[in-house]
Amino acid sequence: MVNDTISDMLTRIRNANMVKHQIVQIPASKMSLAIAEILKQEGFIGDFETYSENEKKYLLISLKYVGKLRKPVICKIERVSKPGLRVYSNSKKLPRILDNLGIAIISTSKGVMTNLKAKELGIGGEVLCYIW
Protein backbone atom coordinates (compact mmCIF):
# COMPACT_ATOMS: atom_id res chain seq x y z
CA MET A 1 0.00 0.00 0.00
CA VAL A 2 1.31 3.41 -0.97
CA ASN A 3 1.21 6.16 1.66
CA ASP A 4 1.16 9.13 -0.72
CA THR A 5 -1.32 8.36 -3.51
CA ILE A 6 -0.88 11.75 -5.20
CA SER A 7 2.90 11.34 -5.54
CA ASP A 8 2.36 7.79 -6.80
CA MET A 9 -0.09 9.04 -9.43
CA LEU A 10 2.19 11.84 -10.61
CA THR A 11 5.20 9.51 -10.75
CA ARG A 12 3.29 6.93 -12.80
CA ILE A 13 2.19 9.63 -15.27
CA ARG A 14 5.73 11.05 -15.47
CA ASN A 15 7.29 7.62 -16.08
CA ALA A 16 4.69 6.64 -18.70
CA ASN A 17 5.29 9.97 -20.47
CA MET A 18 9.05 9.40 -20.59
CA VAL A 19 8.68 6.01 -22.31
CA LYS A 20 5.75 7.27 -24.44
CA HIS A 21 3.11 4.83 -23.23
CA GLN A 22 -0.39 5.52 -24.52
CA ILE A 23 -2.24 4.46 -21.34
CA VAL A 24 -1.24 4.41 -17.67
CA GLN A 25 -3.01 2.49 -14.88
CA ILE A 26 -3.35 4.12 -11.45
CA PRO A 27 -5.11 2.94 -8.27
CA ALA A 28 -8.31 4.99 -8.02
CA SER A 29 -9.16 7.30 -5.13
CA LYS A 30 -11.34 10.39 -4.79
CA MET A 31 -8.27 12.61 -5.02
CA SER A 32 -6.81 10.88 -8.09
CA LEU A 33 -10.21 11.13 -9.83
CA ALA A 34 -10.39 14.86 -9.05
CA ILE A 35 -6.84 15.44 -10.34
CA ALA A 36 -7.53 13.41 -13.50
CA GLU A 37 -10.68 15.46 -14.14
CA ILE A 38 -8.67 18.70 -13.90
CA LEU A 39 -5.94 17.34 -16.20
CA LYS A 40 -8.60 16.41 -18.76
CA GLN A 41 -10.33 19.82 -18.55
CA GLU A 42 -7.01 21.62 -19.01
CA GLY A 43 -6.03 19.42 -21.99
CA PHE A 44 -3.03 17.65 -20.45
CA ILE A 45 -4.50 14.15 -20.87
CA GLY A 46 -6.83 12.65 -23.44
CA ASP A 47 -9.42 10.80 -21.39
CA PHE A 48 -9.73 8.59 -18.33
CA GLU A 49 -12.01 5.83 -17.11
CA THR A 50 -12.37 3.71 -14.00
CA TYR A 51 -12.65 -0.05 -13.81
CA SER A 52 -12.67 -2.68 -11.07
CA GLU A 53 -10.50 -5.76 -10.88
CA ASN A 54 -10.56 -8.14 -7.88
CA GLU A 55 -12.54 -5.59 -5.82
CA LYS A 56 -9.89 -2.89 -6.41
CA LYS A 57 -10.68 0.21 -8.44
CA TYR A 58 -8.24 1.48 -11.03
CA LEU A 59 -8.04 4.56 -13.19
CA LEU A 60 -6.92 4.24 -16.83
CA ILE A 61 -5.51 7.52 -18.12
CA SER A 62 -4.91 8.11 -21.83
CA LEU A 63 -1.85 10.34 -22.31
CA LYS A 64 -1.56 12.96 -25.07
CA TYR A 65 1.34 13.46 -27.46
CA VAL A 66 1.88 15.97 -30.29
CA GLY A 67 3.68 15.85 -33.62
CA LYS A 68 5.45 13.10 -35.53
CA LEU A 69 8.01 12.67 -32.77
CA ARG A 70 5.18 12.18 -30.25
CA LYS A 71 6.33 14.88 -27.84
CA PRO A 72 4.40 14.64 -24.53
CA VAL A 73 1.89 17.41 -23.80
CA ILE A 74 2.98 17.30 -20.13
CA CYS A 75 6.52 18.73 -20.07
CA LYS A 76 6.93 18.61 -16.31
CA ILE A 77 4.79 17.42 -13.43
CA GLU A 78 6.02 18.24 -9.94
CA ARG A 79 4.69 17.48 -6.45
CA VAL A 80 4.72 20.50 -4.11
CA SER A 81 2.93 19.70 -0.84
CA LYS A 82 4.10 16.41 0.63
CA PRO A 83 2.99 14.46 3.72
CA GLY A 84 6.16 15.56 5.54
CA LEU A 85 5.90 19.23 4.52
CA ARG A 86 2.50 20.66 3.66
CA VAL A 87 2.47 23.82 1.53
CA TYR A 88 -0.49 26.19 1.84
CA SER A 89 -1.20 29.43 0.04
CA ASN A 90 -3.85 32.11 0.38
CA SER A 91 -5.71 33.46 -2.64
CA LYS A 92 -3.41 36.46 -3.05
CA LYS A 93 -0.22 34.40 -3.07
CA LEU A 94 -1.33 31.52 -5.31
CA PRO A 95 1.49 30.69 -7.74
CA ARG A 96 1.48 31.55 -11.45
CA ILE A 97 3.09 28.76 -13.46
CA LEU A 98 5.02 29.95 -16.55
CA ASP A 99 2.82 33.04 -16.92
CA ASN A 100 -0.31 30.87 -16.77
CA LEU A 101 0.88 28.40 -19.45
CA GLY A 102 0.94 25.76 -16.73
CA ILE A 103 -1.32 25.10 -13.77
CA ALA A 104 -1.08 24.46 -10.07
CA ILE A 105 -3.61 22.05 -8.59
CA ILE A 106 -4.98 23.33 -5.29
CA SER A 107 -7.01 21.44 -2.68
CA THR A 108 -9.47 23.92 -1.18
CA SER A 109 -12.48 23.81 1.11
CA LYS A 110 -14.63 23.90 -2.06
CA GLY A 111 -12.85 20.94 -3.67
CA VAL A 112 -9.82 20.36 -5.87
CA MET A 113 -9.28 23.03 -8.55
CA THR A 114 -6.67 24.93 -10.54
CA ASN A 115 -4.87 27.99 -9.22
CA LEU A 116 -6.76 30.19 -11.70
CA LYS A 117 -10.19 29.06 -10.50
CA ALA A 118 -9.16 29.35 -6.83
CA LYS A 119 -7.90 32.89 -7.43
CA GLU A 120 -11.15 33.74 -9.23
CA LEU A 121 -13.18 32.45 -6.25
CA GLY A 122 -10.86 34.21 -3.79
CA ILE A 123 -9.93 31.10 -1.81
CA GLY A 124 -6.61 29.50 -0.96
CA GLY A 125 -5.62 26.02 0.04
CA GLU A 126 -3.00 23.30 -0.14
CA VAL A 127 -0.81 23.46 -3.27
CA LEU A 128 -0.71 19.83 -4.43
CA CYS A 129 1.35 20.01 -7.65
CA TYR A 130 2.54 22.05 -10.63
CA ILE A 131 2.01 20.90 -14.22
CA TRP A 132 3.25 22.47 -17.46
UniProtKB/Swiss-Prot annotation:
Belongs to the universal ribosomal protein uS8 family. GO terms for molecular function: rRNA binding; structural constituent of ribosome. Its main location: plastid. It comes from the Eukaryota. It is found in: Plastid, Chloroplast. InterPro entries: Ribosomal_uS8, Ribosomal_uS8_CS, Ribosomal_uS8_sf. One of its GO terms (cellular component) is ribonucleoprotein complex. This is Small ribosomal subunit protein uS8c. Part of the 30S ribosomal subunit. The keyword rRNA-binding applies. GO terms for biological process: translation. PROSITE patterns: RIBOSOMAL_S8 (PS00053). SUPFAM superfamilies: Ribosomal protein S8 (SSF56047). One of the primary rRNA binding proteins, it binds directly to 16S rRNA central domain where it helps coordinate assembly of the platform of the 30S subunit. The keyword Ribosomal protein applies. Keywords: Chloroplast, Plastid, Ribonucleoprotein, Ribosomal protein, RNA-binding, rRNA-binding. It comes from Phaeodactylum tricornutum (strain CCAP 1055/1).
